[in-house]
Swiss-Prot record:
Record carries keyword rRNA-binding: yes
Protein name in the entry: Large ribosomal subunit protein uL10
Subunit structure: Part of the ribosomal stalk of the 50S ribosomal subunit. The N-terminus interacts with L11 and the large rRNA to form the base of the stalk. The C-terminus forms an elongated spine to which L12 dimers bind in a sequential fashion forming a multimeric L10(L12)X complex.
GO molecular function: large ribosomal subunit rRNA binding; structural constituent of ribosome
UniProt entry tagged with the keyword Transmembrane helix: no
Taxonomic lineage: Bacteria, Pseudomonadati, Pseudomonadota, Gammaproteobacteria, Pasteurellales
Protein family (similarity comment): Belongs to the universal ribosomal protein uL10 family.
Lineage top rank: taxon: Bacteria
Gene3D superfamilies recorded: 3.30.70.1730, 6.10.250.2350
Function: Forms part of the ribosomal stalk, playing a central role in the interaction of the ribosome with GTP-bound translation factors.
Amino acid sequence: MALNLQDKQAIVAEVNEAAKGALSAVIADSRGVTVEKMTELRKSAREAGVTMRVVRNTLLRRAVEGTDYECLKDTFVGPTLIAFSNEHPGAAARLFKEFAKANDKFEIKGAAFEGKIQDVEFLATLPTYEEAIARLMGTMKEAAAGKLARTFAALRDKLQEAA
């Protein structure tokens, strides 16, 4: 079905708005994936705070102009599914990576974060805010416990020398 000019402008504006508010973007080719599987992916995306859209490449090129995702233009070949992470930079990459494991025909073309093309593995393995805080707290706790142990050992050595 051919789109009229107003529809095309609305799509470009909608995708551009999503791109401006997104933390990262991932591009994929979903050719050969069943409708049921795509529906599951879309549902998972909504739950993860990811905005997904299938857009014509020419409209997508116009939509990402002036955004951090202009670097992805070379990946806009063939059927293009774009996903924007709104809550966590790795959400879309993690979602697509898991989906690609279960669906052979789903191909991830590229990802961008902070205006640069990034490896999908890098984005998918980024810790969430809660995970990062937990790691930091673990490191701080470990350092404090180590310092306490060294202090007690030094105190013990000093007392043994005095005796």
